[in-house]
């Protein structure tokens, strides 16, 4: 992967947390091209399948929207079965020549499950119910794990505080935070 492509994939932070039967997924709003900020309030989350599933993306916007559209089609085809839809999307992503070139990652949550669909078509289900993608993901992930283990904050509050921490550290992440809940 070339340096410019890495910047496209890594230039945001998306974080999802499941706690006490509720899930929250949020992102910052910064859109960058290379080292230039183009927009401060980009929406990188989307509700899917009758509002029961929340997905967020990191990567090239057009590629991510294409993948989200395909994922939504898979959800409809498999009656909202998250894991089956994710595996089928990943299979298509790996085998379809057009999709294989898309540069994006998806983070997906329901009230019970959290998944990451990687740019290589892998489906990853974290053990702790926390999904994080993008350039500030490791900062947000570390903060979320600590807050989940040592506080009684809600999923939404954990996402908000963790994204604020990531925004303080990562130059590709800002503090214009949008959070969705299920």
Curated annotation (Swiss-Prot):
Catalytic activity from the UniProt record: ATP-dependent cleavage of peptide bonds with broad specificity
CDD domains hit by this protein: protease_HslV
Broad class of enzyme this protein falls into: hydrolase
Regulation: Allosterically activated by HslU binding.
Binding site for Na(+): 167, 170, 173
EC number(s) recorded for this UniProt protein: 3.4.25.2
Keywords: Allosteric enzyme, Cytoplasm, Hydrolase, Metal-binding, Protease, Sodium, Threonine protease
SUPFAM superfamilies: N-terminal nucleophile aminohydrolases (Ntn hydrolases)
Entry's Gene Ontology molecular function annotations: metal ion binding; threonine-type endopeptidase activity
Active-site annotation: 12
A GO term from the CC aspect: HslUV protease complex
Compartments where found: Cytoplasm
Biological processes per GO annotation: proteolysis involved in protein catabolic process
Free-text function comment from the UniProt entry: Protease subunit of a proteasome-like degradation complex believed to be a general protein degrading machinery.
UniProt subunit comment: A double ring-shaped homohexamer of HslV is capped on each side by a ring-shaped HslU homohexamer. The assembly of the HslU/HslV complex is dependent on binding of ATP.
Annotated family: Belongs to the peptidase T1B family. HslV subfamily.
This protein's name: ATP-dependent protease subunit HslV
Lineage: Bacteria, Pseudomonadati, Chlorobiota, Chlorobiia, Chlorobiales
Gene name for this UniProt entry: hslV
